[in-house]
Amino acid sequence: MARLLSELAGLLGLELRGEDRAIEGVNTLEAAGPAEVSFLANPKYTHLLANTRAGAVIVTAEHADAVPCALVSTNPYFDFGRTLALFSKPQGSLSGVSDMAFVHPEAELGEGCTVYPFAFIGPRARIGAGSVLFPGVYVGEDCRVGAGCLLYPNAVLMAGTEIGNGCILHAGVVLGADGFGFARTDFGIQKIPQVGTVRLGNDVEVGANTAIDRSVLGVTTVGDSTKIDNLVQIGHNVEMGRNCLIVSQVGISGSTKVGDDVTMAGQVGVAGHLSIGNGVTLGPKSGVAKSIPDGETMGGAPAVDKATYMRTLTVMPKLPDMYKRIGKLEKELEELKKLAAKE
């Protein structure tokens, strides 16, 4: 559905600079046509403004004069996302509860829920109003799913798992599988029962094939508005705060506490029973073996402060040459020692 730029500006609370026109969609600066909106969030792409054919560009005031028609924003990337939502069509075409889904008689479904074929909702589970469960979703007994949640195909909530309002679970997510708890004995490795639960706050998004394990006792928790990427492993009894960004292939071992506003880049590994403070940033492939106070930026394995990590990155490519030079110096030193001994 086409919308006038003036309408978009009003809906988004942005300033329109330029001629009003109908807009039919959203695209990149390179590909956008006269009936599409684009955006500039990263300054390194500023050069693309000169040749874009976009009907309008969402930009900061600094770049508004670089295009014939601008929607002026203090956060172009965020407002691009809001614009995209206005033009995009949500996935799925069904509504209501399919006859081919299994809904236990003791389960409770809120108003306006959609449950696709082959979903399973167990006894005493409660599904909030307007939530959508795609095919293959498993919601075990005593689970709680908040209002307005999206559970994509084959998402699994094991017994007792709770998620808040507005959560998104992508395909293959598993919440509440047993934590990795075992004891070595004289008669083999024995399983420690995992009898706790998992609880997600409101507006949490969990990427495809991520696993968040149930606690041994108590609750494994993820705070409001935290976003977790694909293929992440969160161990039993982890307590994660609000507004965290956890990128793909991160592994967080059991009983670690993660504060609010923490960012972990791809493939970070965190040992168990640690404390990661508020506002901590961990660079890609960081290996965290000790607790980190609030506000630190760290990288490397083992993780060190940012300044040390950056110096290490600078030195590492030079190591082969340095090794040769040191070897040469050692030989020269030995020759000098021999000469000195003869004197």
UniProtKB/Swiss-Prot annotation:
Reaction(s) this enzyme catalyzes, per UniProt: a UDP-3-O-[(3R)-3-hydroxyacyl]-alpha-D-glucosamine + a (3R)-hydroxyacyl-[ACP] = a UDP-2-N,3-O-bis[(3R)-3-hydroxyacyl]-alpha-D-glucosamine + holo-[ACP] + H(+)
Active site: H236 (proton acceptor)
GO cellular component: membrane
Annotated EC: 2.3.1.191
Matches recorded under Pfam families: Hexapep (PF00132), LpxD (PF04613)
Pathway info: Bacterial outer membrane biogenesis; LPS lipid A biosynthesis
Keywords: Acyltransferase, Lipid A biosynthesis, Lipid biosynthesis, Lipid metabolism, Repeat, Transferase
Superkingdom classification of source: Bacteria
GO biological process: lipid A biosynthetic process
Listed CDD domains: LbH_LpxD (cd03352)
Alphabetized GO MF terms: N-acyltransferase activity
Chain's role: Catalyzes the N-acylation of UDP-3-O-acylglucosamine using 3-hydroxyacyl-ACP as the acyl donor. Is involved in the biosynthesis of lipid A, a phosphorylated glycolipid that anchors the lipopolysaccharide to the outer membrane of the cell.
Family statement drawn from the similarity comment of this UniProt entry: Belongs to the transferase hexapeptide repeat family. LpxD subfamily.
Subunit organization: Homotrimer.
HAMAP family per the UniProt record, alphabetical: LpxD
PANTHER family: UDP-3-O-ACYLGLUCOSAMINE N-ACYLTRANSFERASE, UDP-3-O-ACYLGLUCOSAMINE N-ACYLTRANSFERASE 1, MITOCHONDRIAL-RELATED
Protein name as annotated: UDP-3-O-acylglucosamine N-acyltransferase
Record organism: Nitratidesulfovibrio vulgaris (strain DSM 19637 / Miyazaki F)
